[in-house]
Amino acid sequence: MKMAIAIQCHTNSEQINRLINYFQDDYIDIYIHVDKKSNIISELDIKKNVYLIENRVDVKWGQFSQVDATLNIFKEIRNSDYKYKYIHLISGQDYPIKSLKAFKEYFLYQNSEFIE
């Protein structure tokens, strides 16, 4: 079961690198949208399962630009070579509270969508 992790971020490259390292798995790809105003890309630990969104948006908090950034991530995921069973959208400030094994196992046995 292949999953995609979509991350929107603008700061704190150390935290983004922690997320990248946490989600290292053959069945997980990571798509990262870095705010156009940000200069943290050169500090990110890009691995084989990490894809940077090229069409970056100048995101303004609470404005439609956040939706634009999200849509750009989803477009890139849709245009990839994989058909993912799940796509998880998280902020660069988030961090999972369960182990990667528990995270994967939870979704492995689900047979539903979480958005109607």
Give residue ranges: language-model regions.
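ER/Golgi luminal nucleotide-sugar-dependent glycosyltransferases, focusing on the catalytic module
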Residues: 1-116
